[in-house]
Amino acid sequence: MRSYETMYVLSPDLNEEERKGLIERFKNLIVERGGEITNFDEWGKRKLAYPIQKKSEGYYVLMNFNSSPDVSRELERVYRITDGVLRYLIIRTDD
């Protein structure tokens, strides 16, 4: 298993229930495919450096996890097709 770090920015237009649902969906995707979440941190709503999709704020979430490369590819695919995700980044960390 490899170590990864992901940060994603959710739309500020999502209500709390929708936001928590998306966060749980992403966490479950990792765990159900044999991955392990080692760190999870919700940074909350912050101002963006520049507007993204005409929005000036976003809800930031940071997560570290261990998994196979297939899981990170699937997570990226799900980020891409999820409407509430403004931006995301997944990097492999070397421990």
UniProtKB/Swiss-Prot annotation:
GO terms for molecular function: small ribosomal subunit rRNA binding; structural constituent of ribosome. Disulfide bonds: none annotated. InterPro entries: Ribosomal_bS6, Ribosomal_bS6_sf, Ribosomal_S6_plastid/chlpt, Transl_elong_EF1B/ribsomal_bS6. Keywords: Ribonucleoprotein, Ribosomal protein, RNA-binding, rRNA-binding. GO terms for cellular component: cytoplasm; ribonucleoprotein complex; ribosome. GO terms for biological process: translation. NCBIfam families: S6. HAMAP family: Ribosomal_bS6 (MF_00360). Belongs to the bacterial ribosomal protein bS6 family. Binds together with bS18 to 16S ribosomal RNA. This is Small ribosomal subunit protein bS6. It comes from Caldanaerobacter subterraneus subsp. tengcongensis (strain DSM 15242 / JCM 11007 / NBRC 100824 / MB4). The lineage of its organism: Bacteria, Bacillati, Bacillota, Clostridia, Thermoanaerobacterales. The gene is rpsF.
